[in-house]
């Protein structure tokens, strides 16, 4: 789509990797459709993933009792965050779509990407308790995870030894991305890439490029709207009583995280509602 901007965040150290090939395919496909594409190749940038006092360039509010969340929020408001954090925040602000390309490591994101989230998604910039989830600062933006795994798809199935991929994705897609407001699109899952032959890899890359041609028009994944909850500390941010009563006799819960003690909706974190 002409006029749109995309940010691709890559978390893989090797240019010969399939993750790098997926990133390159995304750049080519989006540019072909008129997108402006910016990259954050975290390993190539030697991005520092460790939060510390060095993230604040100005005077600390309480150096004797340093608390990173409070100090980083103040530094953001006063313009005293370190330049590398500010640079990434500017990329995010300009982006309509953010693609995260990485290998699944220990059932989560690589450490360097986790550090990127921790340092860049500063309070007041990426979230507040008054504006989170579908009311979050990034609510007009879309995000998609493009993940490779070592294990096969069956290993991440309901009966698989690793357990349901939907459960693995929830902390990332809901706890990080949607928490900050992102409309999260269906993840691009590439299973068992180390055991995938060359011809099949080419097909995967072509399928990814094909999907990206119309990715802006895709339906986001479903997350329980914040309007279903009492959004204040006195009420405990709990689901409203009338909503609980309404959902009581339904077969499935609302989502992976809001299962309400019932069966999880099938592929809640993998497929958008039709």
From Swiss-Prot:
Source organism, top-level taxon: Eukaryota
EC top class, as a word: oxidoreductase
An annotated Gene Ontology molecular function: NADPH dehydrogenase (quinone) activity
GO biological-process terms attached to the record: cell redox homeostasis; cellular response to oxidative stress; innate immune response; negative regulation of ferroptosis; negative regulation of protein catabolic process; protein catabolic process; protein polyubiquitination; removal of superoxide radicals
Modified residues annotated as Phosphoserine in this record: 82
Alphabetic keyword roster: Cytoplasm, FAD, Flavoprotein, Isopeptide bond, NAD, NADP, Oxidoreductase, Phosphoprotein, Ubl conjugation
Binding site for substrate: 126-128
EC number: 1.6.5.2
One cellular component term from this protein's GO annotations in UniProt: nucleus
Record-stated family: Belongs to the NAD(P)H dehydrogenase (quinone) family.
Protein name: NAD(P)H dehydrogenase [quinone] 1
